């Protein structure tokens, strides 16, 4: 036995042939080529106009990912023109047939032998022809009116754009309503606490609509310093009432101190037929009772009847009360409007 020959294995089988990695590399190249083709399809599609439409549509459907994009304005105009193509063909046919009908009488007049032969047209066919001509004339008149307007396509495009803008505004308004309602909630919390609210006010102004931003004007005045709460107004009214009574003391009141004079006046009970108290003391006492019951609007309305020197002490408190009432009314109205818009999102 030659020394170069290899001895067979103990089982008598040949050793297995070694496989190279050529097949795996080929599969990898094919996968990379497919991925590159899919990614480059948007760039290649306009440059492959000579390919058949079915092949391009099959490739486009296979390479597109996600939902189809909405048609643009140019595409919609192309669809409108395609829909008007049959009408244009009918108009051309109508013009041809009208020309033939106009030529027939002239031909008949030029050839009197046909009239002598007694050739007459079918009445049913003539009536059908007249109805068809009337229909075609109506269609032709409509198209001619549209064609006479040089800016018809521009007007149509502008109308479509206006409609799309209106739909976008409605959708944006519905989407911003919950955010505006949340901003109003934070603004109301700050106003109820009596603390400054510049950040909350800025957020509300950004999210508010054009017509709604004007309703936030009562809240702008107190954004830097805050608005006095209802409890604070009720507590500060005691000081205001005392200052108003001091200013209301007449010059010829004599030597009797004001507190003793008020005590003497309260010791005498006078039943009045109208059921109301008179003078500054009556107004201040009624205002105190209304504030104790939580009726700030009624207290402010009653206090506006005060006159005389005491008005200088009452006016600052009255302005603070009116600002509080205006702020509460504006927040309530804006919250109701925002909730109405937000509730219509699913309609």
Swiss-Prot record:
Origin organism lineage: Bacteria, Pseudomonadati, Pseudomonadota, Alphaproteobacteria, Rhodospirillales
Localization per record: Magnetosome membrane
Further comment found in the protein's record: This bacteria makes up to 60 cubo-octahedral magnetosomes of about 45 nm in diameter which contain membrane-bound crystals of magnetite (Fe(3)O(4)).
Signal peptide per UniProt: none
Species in which this protein is naturally found: Magnetospirillum gryphiswaldense (strain DSM 6361 / JCM 21280 / NBRC 15271 / MSR-1)
Changes seen on gene knockout: Normal magnetic response, fewer, larger magnetosomes; cells accumulate 20% more iron. Deletion of the 4 gene operon (mms6, mmsF, mms36 and mms48) gives an intermediate magnetic response with fewer, smaller magnetosomes in irregular pseudo-chains. Deletion of approximately 80 kb of DNA, including this gene, leads to cells that are non-magnetic, lack internal membrane systems, grow poorly, have reduced mobility and take-up and accumulate iron poorly.
Transmembrane segments: 25-45
Induction of synthesis: Part of the probable mms6 operon.
Role of this protein: The 4 genes of this operon collectively influence magnetosome size and number.
Recorded coiled-coil stretches: none
Membrane topology: Single-pass membrane protein
A cellular component term, taken from the record's GO annotations: magnetosome membrane
Name of this chain's protein: Probable magnetosome protein Mms36
Keywords: Biomineralization, Magnetosome, Membrane, Transmembrane, Transmembrane helix
Domain of life: Bacteria
